[in-house]
Amino acid sequence: MARIAGVNIPTNKRVIIALQYIHGIGPKFAQEITEKVGIPTGRRVHELSDAEVLQIREAIDQGYQVEGDLRREVAMNVKRLMDLGCYRGLRHRRSLPVRGQRTHTNARTRKGPAKAIAGKKK
């Protein structure tokens, strides 16, 4: 298994697919990285030489924010919104949808399981 950006990527998959196991690298960035390094699209990870793996590592380190750094930045952005006390920050703090979605019904994923409320007896 090749270890890139602190992640063991699967050896039997194509390089473009395997790179997407790294948090912060999707299909577009994986394609860009392989083109930059000059690896054919059909090549599998176990067929890569150590030099090619090193080139991929360097390309990711230079141009992309991945894994822990990316997670930390996203968490800091959310914390900043909450500290500002803006509308988006309040929605994050209350664990409600942030982007204007309906909450009267739906939003169960964000709000958690339904809480039972005693109703009128018939």
Curated annotation (Swiss-Prot):
Cited InterPro entries: Rbsml_uS13_C (IPR027437), Ribosomal_uS13 (IPR001892), Ribosomal_uS13-like_H2TH (IPR010979), Ribosomal_uS13_bac-type (IPR019980), Ribosomal_uS13_CS (IPR018269)
Renumbered residue ranges of the record's region Disordered: 97-122
GO biological process: translation
Function: Located at the top of the head of the 30S subunit, it contacts several helices of the 16S rRNA. In the 70S ribosome it contacts the 23S rRNA (bridge B1a) and protein L5 of the 50S subunit (bridge B1b), connecting the 2 subunits; these bridges are implicated in subunit movement. Contacts the tRNAs in the A and P-sites.
Record's subunit section: Part of the 30S ribosomal subunit. Forms a loose heterodimer with protein S19. Forms two bridges to the 50S subunit in the 70S ribosome.
The family this protein is said to belong to: Belongs to the universal ribosomal protein uS13 family.
Protein name, as recorded: Small ribosomal subunit protein uS13
Organism: Bartonella tribocorum (strain CIP 105476 / IBS 506)
